[in-house]
């Protein structure tokens, strides 16, 4: 989840703040301890008394993930929880942030009203945002700087199956950019690497380096973390893309 992105950023020596909702339970306490151990500021984690902390159990065999069991409560956050999150983020924006990462897993935190307020704050303070999307309704991401779908997620958004070819990816991305207020689509393409399509028409392709992979869990989080770190540091898109792809 978002905590994995936060941990990746912290391991890159980035000062990280994390916001979200956890339950008042043992797993929630463990989450807070893990965040503390990575030096991540968790003051934005709202503790809910009527929601359990999302927990995932991975079943591995021969170094590969065979299946995953999720234990979770899926529903929109309460109004009070939303207000706490936005107040926390507003305070940070006033102090100064270099970037905002939004990890949407469709669990109820990234609802339309919260995202609208996040993008309004980010644009007001000129802070770049990068979104890891969920689902086919991307109108809620209008105002984002970057969005990082994989081929399957991009296919879901345009409503038809896309083959993993440069021209097909570019065509689909341009279709999305024409109907959504998003500046860049960063398409992660497995063995084909990463492609970036900008609203102004610029296109970058960076092929992947072939290597044996036993578990791709978290690969998208790695791309999000590296891209945000590089771009927030002022590196060019081409260099950021090269570094993120190599990670």
Language-model region placement:
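Substrate-binding N-lobe of the ribokinase-like
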Residues: 1-55
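Extended, hydrophobic alpha-helical segments in both membrane/secreted and soluble proteins
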Residues: 101-102, 118, 129-131, 137-140, ...
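Short acidic, glycine-rich surface-loop motifs adjacent to enzyme active sites
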Residues: 92-109
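Conserved phosphate/ATP/ADP-binding segment of small-molecule kinases
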Residues: 107-203
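Conserved phosphate-binding/catalytic loop of the ribokinase/pfkB sugar-kinase fold
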Residues: 45-51, 58-95
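A structural signal for isolated positions on well-ordered beta-strands in alpha/beta enzyme cores
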Residues: 17-21, 44, 99-101, 130, ...
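Conserved post-catalytic alpha-helical subdomain immediately downstream of the catalytic base
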Residues: 180-183, 209-247
């Amino acid at each position: 989840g978002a905590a994995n992105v936060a941990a990746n950023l912290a391991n890159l020596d980035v000062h990280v703040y994390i916001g979200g909702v956890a339950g008042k339970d043992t797993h929630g306490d463990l989450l807070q301890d893990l965040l503390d151990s990575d030096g991540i500021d968790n003051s934005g984690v709202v503790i809910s008394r009527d929601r359990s902390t999302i927990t995932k159990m991975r079943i591995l065999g021969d170094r590969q993930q065979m299946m995953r069991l999720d234990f979770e409560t899926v529903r929109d956050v309460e109004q009070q929880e939303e207000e706490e999150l936005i107040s926390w983020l507003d305070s940070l924006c006033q102090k100064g942030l270099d970037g905002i990462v939004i990890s949407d897993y469709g669990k109820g935190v990234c609802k339309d009203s919260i995202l609208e307020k996040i993008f309004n704050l980010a644009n007001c303070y000129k802070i770049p945002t990068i979104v890891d999307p969920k689902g086919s309704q991307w109108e809620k991401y209008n105002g984002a700087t970057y969005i990082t779908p994989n081929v399957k997620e991009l296919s879901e958004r345009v409503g038809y199956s896309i083959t993993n070819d440069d021209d097909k990816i570019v065509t689909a991305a341009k279709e999305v950019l024409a109907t959504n207020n998003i500046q860049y689509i960063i398409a992660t393409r497995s063995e084909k690497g990463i492609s970036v399509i900008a609203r102004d028409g610029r296109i970058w392709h960076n092929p992947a380096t072939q290597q044996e992979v036993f578990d791709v869990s978290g690969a998208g989080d790695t791309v999000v973390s590296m891209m945000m770190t590089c771009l927030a540091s002022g590196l060019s898109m081409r260099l950021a893309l090269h570094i993120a792809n190599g990670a």
